[in-house]
Amino acid sequence: MNEPVLFLLLLLALGFLAKNKSLIVAIVVLLAIKLVGLDQKVLPIIQSKGINWGVTVITIAVLAPIASGEIGFRQLVGSLQSLSAWVALASGIFVALIAKNGVTLLANDPHMTAALAFGTILAVSLFHGVAVGPLIGAGIAYTVIKMVEYF
């Protein structure tokens, strides 16, 4: 058994122990790709485009209530009358700006990707986190690195 499969099986066990369906599904899909022999063709595409696909799917999910008519201009204007909505608005802007720098860091430093991926795997499997961490984590890492370089 090769190292990637063994590593994935170990992570699959963690996924089952943590009862994390997203992690389990992701690993089963990756193992299936390897099992049928498409890994050389498919995995590089997933690796290079997967984050963008994921962001697109999340964006679709966030915009679905607008498309369904559940959220309209009235709800938007009404929500901006509360302090909580303004905090959410500022948080959304802040996180999007942080994540932008994360894309830059992941593209320029492949070694960072391994550490961030492992941190995300630990958070997802052990603490029931959600796997949006690598992009935000990379953005935070980028910001901290730039601050350290500045001083």
Curated annotation (Swiss-Prot):
InterPro entries: UPF0756_TM
Transmembrane segments: 5-25, 53-73, 79-99, 121-141
KW Signal (keyword) present: no
Localisation per UniProt entry: Cell membrane
Membrane topology listed for this record: Multi-pass membrane protein
GO cellular component, one term: plasma membrane
Source domain of life: Bacteria
Alphabetic keyword roster: Cell membrane, Membrane, Transmembrane, Transmembrane helix
Family membership: Belongs to the UPF0756 family.
Name under which the protein is recorded: UPF0756 membrane protein GK2737
Native source species: Geobacillus kaustophilus (strain HTA426)
